[in-house]
Regions:
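N-terminal pre-domain segments of enzymes
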Residues: 1-31
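Accessory beta-strand-rich segments of carbohydrate-active enzymes
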Residues: 4, 8, 28, 65-181, ...
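Predominantly extracellular/luminal regions of secreted and cell-surface proteins
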Residues: 21-49
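Residue-level detector of high-confidence beta-strand sites
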Residues: 27, 47, 107, 233-235
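Beta-strand-rich binding/interaction modules
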Residues: 100, 198-239
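Aromatic sugar-binding surface patches on proteins
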Residues: 113-115, 243-251
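Solvent-exposed, conformationally flexible loop/turn segments
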Residues: 126-128, 199, 241-247
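Short, solvent-exposed loop/linker segments at the N-terminal edge
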Residues: 190-200
């Protein structure tokens, strides 16, 4: 990822960099998930964070293995009240639990897939909010890589080792591939057939979810050359009932 510390351009879907200003401690702490927990004595870190710095030759088993905590306070402005609010973690190594304002909203077992969480019902628009993350990279054979770290010839560290985003969008939206829980069906799914030197058939599925009132949506797909010129386009109209979803198909 190239998130750095920059905010993306505003649009229907706004992604705000959430990397800066986390509190961190490399140990387990009782009660750290609570909204009013005092974390003022913890270190301040910016993400991504791999728990520690290790020498160049650091194979599996040399690194710290165990729980660590991250906490961050944030405010939401009134313009977001009509939107869905999403926390998107690109990667938390090991077992993780995530709380917002003291409510546990996600438990995850994998360090390699993103965690895309709808927190709309848990956030406050008038007072500061708190997100707390417990990340545990201890040995656990129930998820990848599936063996003790001492048996590995590499170190996968721990912590929130990839970027984090606060995302807002409308209640009618293109779903996220992992959050949709549809095999090869969430988000935008593209595959190719009949490939030759002269042509190729491009198939695109777009998963659109409507959590608002009944409405008409238009799904537009453009195939662009490297210079940005459109060489093919498709526009389809769909009637979406209240609180319903549709998968669009284009060739």
């Amino acid at each position: 990822s190239t998130a750095g510390f920059y905010q993306t351009d505003k649009g229907v879907r706004e992604a705000i960099n959430f990397n800066v200003g986390w509190r961190f401690i490399k140990q387990d702490v009782t009660g750290a998930e609570k909204h009013d927990f005092d974390d003022s004595a913890w270190s301040v870190v910016n993400l991504p964070d791999g728990l520690e710095l290790l020498p160049l030759a650091a194979s599996g088993g040399v690194n710290y293995q165990g729980p660590a905590w991250y906490r961050k306070q944030f405010n939401l402005n009134e313009t977001m009240r009509s939107k869905k609010v999403i926390l998107h973690f690109e990667g938390i190594m090991g077992k993780s639990k995530i709380w917002v304002n003291g409510a546990m909203i996600k438990e995850n077992f994998s360090g390699y897939y993103p965690i895309h969480i709808d927190v709309t019902e848990y956030v406050d628009f008038k007072k500061p909010n708190t997100v707390a993350v417990r990340a545990d990279n201890s040995n656990d054979k129930t998820y990848p890589p599936g063996k003790s770290q001492e048996q590995l010839d590499f170190t996968y560290f721990g912590g929130i080792y990839r970027d984090v985003w606060l995302i807002t969008h409308n209640h009618t939206y293109v779903t996220h591939p992992t959050a949709a829980e549809k095999v090869a069906g969430g988000g935008v799914f593209v595959h190719y057939e009949n490939l030759s030197e002269k042509s190729v058939d491009v198939f695109v599925n777009v998963d659109v979810n409507n959590e608002g009132k009944k409405m008409t949506v238009f799904v537009q797909l453009d195939l662009l050359e490297s210079d940005g010129k459109a060489v093919a386009s498709s526009v389809k109209e769909y009637q979406l009932p209240k609180k319903n979803a549709v998968q669009t198909h284009a060739q």
